[in-house]
Amino acid sequence: MSTYVVGDIQGCFEPFQYLLERVKFNPDKDRLWSVGDLINRGPDNIEVLRWFYAHRDNVTMVLGNHDLHLMAVSCGARKPSRKDNLEDILDAPDREQLIEWLHFQPLAHFEDGVTMVHAGIPPIWTVQDTLDRAWEVENALQGARCEEFLTEMYGNDPHVWDDSLSGMTRLRVITNYLTRMRYCTRKGKLDFVSKGPQPIPDAVAGKKVAPWFSHKRRLTKGQTIIFGHWASLEGMTDDPKAIGLDTGCVWGNALTFYELETGRRITCECAKSVHI
C-alpha cells in the first residue's frame, strides 16, 4: 500500500490522470491525499471534482482557497472573478452533491506524525492549535451560518492572530493562515503582497518577513508539514520537513505526486491553462 500526496491540481485532469497511471494507483489498496485547490483556472474542473467524489473513501484532502471560493460562488455569497472558470461545475447536474461533499472536508489533517494544510501554519501555532482552529472554520462551513461565513471570509484584516478574536474576524484570520499565507513575521503578521520566491521590501511596514516555514523559532519546527499553494517555490523549501507540492501545473509547469512512505517525488509537465 502506498500513500501519495498530490499538489494543487486546479482542474488539470489530464496530468492528474497521467500520474495516477504512472504510479499504478490502485484504489483498492493505495490512498491519495490532496493539499487542496482541486479546481479553478484549469480546463477540467468538474472531472477532477467527480474523480475525488467517486474515490472519496480512499482520498484525504484539505480545503484550499479556490475550493472555498467555489462554495462561496455556488451559494451566491460571492460573484465569480474575471479569472474564474467554474461554469462546468456550477452548470453540472450533480453540483449540489459535489459541493456539499466539499463542505465536509477539513482545513488541516494530521496522521502518523504528518500534518497537511493548504498554505501553511503560522510560526506562533502548534499542530494542535492548527487542528483546533481549523475545526472552528470547518464547523462554520457545516452549520447554519455557512453562507454568512462564506460572505465574510474575504479580506486581509485582521492580518495577525490574537487569542481574543471572535466571530467572523477570528474565522477570517484562521482561514487566511491556512489557505492564503506565504510570508509572515515571526509573530505571525501576514504579508499578502509578496508571492514570489523573495519577499517584496517593506511589504509589511517596518517588519521583517520570511516564508512561514523559515522562522527558526516556529512552534512546529522539526515536524513534517505538507502544503501547496505557493507555485513560485517550485516545491523547494529550506526545511526538509516542510514539503511544498504546488509546482504550478495550471501555470504550465508541473504536477507533483509525493509518496509519503519513501519521500519520492513523481512529476509530469503541464500545459499552461488558457484561463490564467
Residue ranges of each PLM-predicted region?
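Active-site neighborhood of phospho(di)ester-bond hydrolases with catalytic His/Asp-centered motifs
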Residues: V6-G7, W33-G36, M61-G64, I225-G228, ...
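Acidic, His/Gly-rich catalytic cores of divalent-metal-dependent hydrolytic chemistry
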Residues: L131-I276
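Active-site environment of divalent metal-dependent phosphoester hydrolases
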Residues: C12-E14, N40-G42, H66-A72, H109, ...
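Active-site-proximal beta-strand elements of phosphoester/diester hydrolases
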Residues: S2-Q10, V114-G120, G244-L245
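Active-site neighborhood of divalent metal-dependent phosphoester bond hydrolases
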Residues: I46-L49, A54-T169
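Glycine-rich phosphate-binding loop signature in dinucleotide/nucleotide-binding domains
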Residues: V23-D28, H55, E111, L219-T220
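N-terminal active-site segment of His-dependent metallophosphoesterases
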Residues: M1-W51, L68
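Short, conserved active-site loop motifs that form the nucleotide-linked donor/cofactor pocket
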Residues: T3, D30, V59, V114, ...
